[in-house]
From Swiss-Prot:
Its cofactor is Zn(2+). The active site is at D118, Y225. Substrate binds at G26, N27, S43, G44, S72, S73. This is L-ribulose-5-phosphate 4-epimerase UlaF. It comes from Salmonella paratyphi C (strain RKS4594). The gene is ulaF. Catalyzes the isomerization of L-ribulose 5-phosphate to D-xylulose 5-phosphate. Is involved in the anaerobic L-ascorbate utilization. Keywords: Carbohydrate metabolism, Isomerase, Metal-binding, Zinc. Zn(2+) binds at D74, H93, H95, H167. One of its GO terms (molecular function) is L-ribulose-phosphate 4-epimerase activity. Belongs to the aldolase class II family. AraD/FucA subfamily.
């Protein structure tokens, strides 16, 4: 597990590096599918003092199996996503400014241009509000459930992120590094959408044919973007 702990530590340290977190407002995890174990950031530990061995290992029920700290308070959300989507290898949650602003506004981040379409096949959805019962009950688990409910039958790696109503963004990927990459892109396209809508409030979404081209040339079966 040491290799995975290093990867998760590095991914967590990328959050302040890319300006996605203030104080301790974020967490990254990754899963070892063969062992059924998840490595995640400890709860409330400052990035400035955090070390590789501070990462916490939990089983799929959230029980700590390795580590001297409590795991992130969002652990149950991460576990719900891993259990539902076998293609996920890493999950990240932040309160990055622009993506969180869309969450607080209760609005999906609209697909307005090719930067968005290179990573997200359509709008980045916003969940419904959690009920009082859901919040007072198993809040973090119910956050995972409302993400799953909102995604429906969507392939999660085609829409590798979401904003939770009045809360903030979650992103995911094939591993922890990929999840952080998608979180960085989500914050950038959230900012771009806010600026673009300010310039032209009547702006239309990106044309489907242009969105399809940009997404499929990177992620489709005949993708040709980048090097082999």
């Amino acid at each position: 597990m040491q290799k995975l702990k290093q990867q998760v530590f590095d991914a967590n340290m990328d959050l302040p590096r890319y300006g996605l977190v203030t104080f301790t407002w974020g967490n990254v995890s990754a899963i070892d599918r063969e062992r059924g174990l998840v490595v995640i950031k400890p709860s409330g530990v400052a990035y400035e003092t955090m070390k590789v061995d501070d990462m916490v290992v939990v089983d799929m029920d959230g029980k700590v199996v390795e580590g001297g700290y409590r795991p992130s308070s969002d652990t149950a959300t991460h576990l719900a996503l891993y259990q539902r989507y076998p293609s996920l290898g890493g999950v990240v949650h932040t309160h990055s400014t622009h993506a969180t602003a869309w969450a607080q506004a209760g609005m999906a981040i609209p697909a307005l241009g090719t930067t968005h379409a290179d990573y997200f096949f359509g709008d980045i959805p916003c969940t419904r509000a959690l009920s009082e019962e859901e919040v007072q009950g198993e809040y973090e688990l119910n956050t995972g459930k409302v993400i799953i409910e909102t995604l429906g039958e969507v392939e999660p790696l085609h829409t590798p992120g979401i904003v939770v109503y009045q809360h903030g963004p979650f992103a995911w990927g094939k591993d922890a590094h990929d999840a952080v990459h998608n979180a960085v892109v989500m914050e950038e396209v959230a900012k771009m959408a806010w600026i673009a809508r300010g310039i032209n409030p009547a702006l239309n979404p990106i044309d489907d044919y242009l969105m399809n081209k940009h997404f499929m040339r990177k992620h489709g079966p005949n993708a040709y973007y980048g090097q082999k």
